[in-house]
């Protein structure tokens, strides 16, 4: 039984040489966020009183990227093994709390498995997460006597008989702070690697008569670490497959689960259909009967009931009411809002603008910093000229306005209800209700005109 108080140590000091990258290994993204963030999130969900993050290589970048004031940063200046890393964190351990040891490059460890490990830890003993492998080569072996764990021996230090053992150490364990500090102080580096192994505390605990309980993870992928990009990509696919399966079982129709990426959180209604190669980032909310076409990217957006997003459309920080249609090849940038029944067609970009109920922008337009009323038609090629090189200005368009093709609205400008803007017009002054505005150069016809001929 674990103590009521629990803190977590996350080892994240490694350079990750085999990643061949300037980025610290634990900052490489999995499902849209750094590997180590997955581990931090798990620790927080467990209710850890403190999270101690042991860092070394790329420490400043780690601090800048994670920017979490609740983390306690512990420097491991030299990487001399897992035991040495824990020794750096040991001064922060309270005697009466449990200490759970995790790894920043083992990102898929589940809260459920960790809760079982904490619950299984004997009073005053150690809880150890282990797995059995068909090919345990390279891993530390769990040594038992009469069924009881008595030690862990690393592969390089193991005898031939010990190498036949198929139960291996995952590195994840929990022990109480008082005993753990004492055992850490007794570690030495008299081994093939010349490092301080955290695994040596198992033999020390056994010598003290402490019980050591083992727990297996629900899935092997939970304890798989990342040392190179191949392993990272494999875990990415494992994670995405799991997310896709959960969505399918919850009623979301993924037309090809192997070509769907969830890099955040998806909240959804009923009868959702998502085509291939769709990417979900941040927190996305989909209402009932929403249809998402192939190749779309949705980030931090809300899409109302019965709306359809056609292929290759990008939505970021946008909000759509019910029965909206967007795309194909449209882009809604932060602050874009579509009222019920609004339509945005191909190659239309909307930024920090609201399109009113039933309004349409069908083709090739830019609408930025604008408030557009209900029942408005935005003709092809319309641009709200919102920026003078220094400041942004707003365009306001009332209800039932017809804006002809190739119109430029030079903000700040207001077009009142019912107005009509002729094609090719540049609007520089406010337009009153029900006015027709046209600004064009007089059309000239020259008979018999001959185009210039290139000199040979």
Curated annotation (Swiss-Prot):
Any single Gene Ontology cellular-component annotation: membrane
Cofactor requirement = Mg(2+)
Would the keyword RNA-binding be found if you checked this record's keyword annotation?
Answer: no
Annotated HAMAP family? GlmU
Answer whether the UniProt record assigns the keyword Cytoplasm to this protein.
Answer: yes
Residues involved in UDP-N-acetyl-alpha-D-glucosamine binding: 11-14, 25, 76, 81-82, 103-105, 140, 154, 169, 227, 333, 351, 366, 377
PROSITE patterns tied to this protein: HEXAPEP_TRANSFERASES
Alphabetized PANTHER family for the sequence: BIFUNCTIONAL PROTEIN GLMU (PTHR43584:SF3), NUCLEOTIDYL TRANSFERASE (PTHR43584)
Instruction: Quote the subcellular location field of this record.
Output: Cytoplasm
Species of provenance: Yersinia pestis (strain Pestoides F)
Its EC number is 2.7.7.23, 2.3.1.157
Q: What does this protein do?
A: Catalyzes the last two sequential reactions in the de novo biosynthetic pathway for UDP-N-acetylglucosamine (UDP-GlcNAc). The C-terminal domain catalyzes the transfer of acetyl group from acetyl coenzyme A to glucosamine-1-phosphate (GlcN-1-P) to produce N-acetylglucosamine-1-phosphate (GlcNAc-1-P), which is converted into UDP-GlcNAc by the transfer of uridine 5-monophosphate (from uridine 5-triphosphate), a reaction catalyzed by the N-terminal domain.
Family per similarity comment: In the N-terminal section; belongs to the N-acetylglucosamine-1-phosphate uridyltransferase family.
Its annotated pathway reads: Nucleotide-sugar biosynthesis; UDP-N-acetyl-alpha-D-glucosamine biosynthesis; N-acetyl-alpha-D-glucosamine 1-phosphate from alpha-D-glucosamine 6-phosphate (route II): step 2/2; Nucleotide-sugar biosynthesis; UDP-N-acetyl-alpha-D-glucosamine biosynthesis; UDP-N-acetyl-alpha-D-glucosamine from N-acetyl-alpha-D-glucosamine 1-phosphate: step 1/1; Bacterial outer membrane biogenesis; LPS lipid A biosynthesis
What's in the keyword line of the UniProt record?
A: Acyltransferase, Cell shape, Cell wall biogenesis/degradation, Cytoplasm, Magnesium, Metal-binding, Multifunctional enzyme, Nucleotidyltransferase, Peptidoglycan synthesis, Repeat, Transferase
Q: What is the name attached to this protein's record?
A: Bifunctional protein GlmU
Q: Gene name on record?
A: glmU
């Amino acid at each position: 039984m674990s103590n009521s108080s629990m803190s977590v140590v996350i080892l994240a000091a490694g350079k990750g040489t085999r990643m061949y990258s300037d980025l610290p290994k634990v900052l490489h993204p999995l499902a849209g966020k750094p590997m180590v963030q997955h581990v931090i999130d798990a620790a927080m969900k467990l209710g850890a009183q403190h999270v101690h993050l042991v860092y070394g290589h790329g420490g400043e970048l780690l601090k800048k990227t994670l920017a979490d004031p609740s983390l306690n940063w512990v420097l491991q200046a030299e990487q001399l093994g897992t035991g040495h890393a824990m020794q750096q964190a040991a001064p922060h351990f309270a005697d009466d709390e449990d200490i759970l040891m995790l790894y920043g490059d083992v990102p898929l460890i589940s809260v459920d498995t960790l809760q079982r490990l904490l619950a299984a830890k004997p009073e005053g003993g150690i809880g150890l997460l282990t797995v059995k492998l068909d090919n345990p080569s390279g891993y530390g072996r769990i040594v038992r006597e009469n069924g009881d764990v008595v030690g862990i021996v690393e592969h390089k230090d193991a005898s031939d008989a010990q190498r036949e053992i198929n139960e291996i150490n995952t590195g994840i364990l929990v022990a109480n702070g008082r005993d753990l500090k004492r055992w850490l102080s007794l570690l030495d580096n008299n081994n093939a690697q010349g490092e301080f192994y955290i695994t040596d505390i198992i033999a020390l605990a056994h010598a003290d008569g402490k019980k050591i309980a083992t727990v297996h993870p629900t899935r092997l992928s939970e304890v798989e670490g990342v040392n190179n990009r191949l392993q990272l990509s494999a875990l990415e696919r494992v994670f995405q497959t799991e997310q896709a399966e959960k969505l399918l079982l919850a009623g979301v129709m993924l037309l090809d689960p192997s070509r769907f990426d969830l890099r955040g959180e998806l909240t959804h209604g009923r009868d959702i259909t998502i085509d291939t190669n769709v990417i979900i980032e941040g927190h996305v909310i989909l209402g009932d009967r929403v249809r998402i076409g192939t190749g779309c990217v949705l980030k931090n957006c809300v899409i109302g009931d019965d709306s359809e997003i056609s292929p290759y459309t990008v939505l970021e920080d946008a909000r759509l009411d019910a029965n909206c249609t967007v795309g194909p090849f449209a882009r809604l940038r932060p602050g874009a809002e579509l009222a019920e029944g609004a339509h945005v067609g191909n190659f239309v970009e909307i930024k920090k603008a609201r399109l009113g109920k039933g309004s349409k922008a069908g083709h090739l337009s830019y609408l930025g910093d604008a408030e557009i009323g209900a029942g408005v038609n935005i003709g092809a090629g319309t641009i709200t000229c919102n920026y003078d090189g220094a400041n942004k200005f707003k365009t306001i368009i009332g209800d039932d306005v017809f804006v002809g093709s190739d119109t430029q609205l030079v903000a700040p400008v207001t077009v009142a209800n019912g107005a009509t803007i002729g094609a090719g017009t540049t609007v520089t002054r406010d337009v009153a209700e029900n006015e027709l505005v046209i600004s064009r150069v007089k059309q000239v016809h020259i008979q018999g005109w001959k185009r210039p001929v290139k000199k040979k």
